[in-house]
């Protein structure tokens, strides 16, 4: 077969994977608010009102995703479609609604471009929450890891950024759910009775912030009622 035909067929097959527009999967729980969600308007509010900054980029929206076994390396990952962040892969609004097993690994990837005004500032990458354990790469360099499905975390990614052009983020996630003794609420692989569907992967807002070289990272109020 002509090489040009093979290339055309391969390109057509790849385009079909990402050609389908995002839409919710299933119809188990649908509220009036869920019906209004789109990749363009998903969770646009600043995620940390206690310490709000003017210069920030919301990374919620469509990311590429793939589910592999845990032995699959990054270089062998083939992305199979798009997932709407920040919804867990098991959820309807993710657009995927797949069962995620403790032996699986969930991969995310997306690109972003920084505003030129951020050039002389530090850039911090924030995750509201990722369930349960994850690794994060920026421009193919490992930035860090995090373990725990309910708490926010962040990385200063300044030294990993390119001087210009698109930047790439990749996240790999594993979730033992009820196969290990971890904080998981009522999540269980076998949903029955009082148990409910697991929540795996990115399930809170992901965002970038431009900060000065010296900046306030956290505020911890301390009160003393006796002094009043």
Summary of predicted features, one role per range:
Residues 8-16:
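Bacterial N-terminal signal peptides
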Residues 64-68, 88, 98-218:
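Accessory beta-strand-rich segments of carbohydrate-active enzymes
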Residues 1-7:
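Bacterial N-terminal signal peptides that target proteins for export
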Residues 80, 95-96, 100:
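Histidine-centered catalytic/metal-coordination loop motif
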Residues 20-56:
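N-terminal pre-domain segments of enzymes
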Residues 61-86:
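Predominantly extracellular/luminal regions of secreted and cell-surface proteins
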